[in-house]
Amino acid sequence: MTSKYQYHFTKKAEADLDEILSYISIELSNPEAAASFLKDFLAVLTSICSVPKIGSIVKNEFLPNKEIRKSLVGNYVLYYLPDIKEKRIYVLRLLYGRRNLDELVREINHF
């Protein structure tokens, strides 16, 4: 699969990924699972870079006229914003799937 788009992590998304990998590797004492999660994450990100609209649109009253999308990575949700003109994927957040969506969307809205 050839990537058409480049990706860019927000500082929060970078911190999210670091936190998840540390939690799995250190807190759960399972570095193999952390490596597996990273592999799955990169596979999803590669798919998104090839087909930016592959994820479903996040529908929420706090996001009017936005194209923020989401894709699953295991028990986590990857939130991203495709920029068609710049051919760039902005990785906004990577969060545990049961987190409060309204709270998250308010944060993303200030991107």
Protein language model annotation of sequence segments:
Residues 1-40:
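Arg/Lys-rich, positively charged N-terminal/basic patches that mediate binding to nucleic acids
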Residues 2, 52, 58, 90, ...:
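Residue-level signal for pocket-adjacent positions within structured domains
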Residues 36-37, 54-57, 111:
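Juxtamembrane/interface motifs at transmembrane-helix termini
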Residues 42-46, 50:
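Compact soluble domain cores
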Residues 51-85:
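Basic/aromatic recognition patch in beta-strand/loop cores that engages polyanionic ligands
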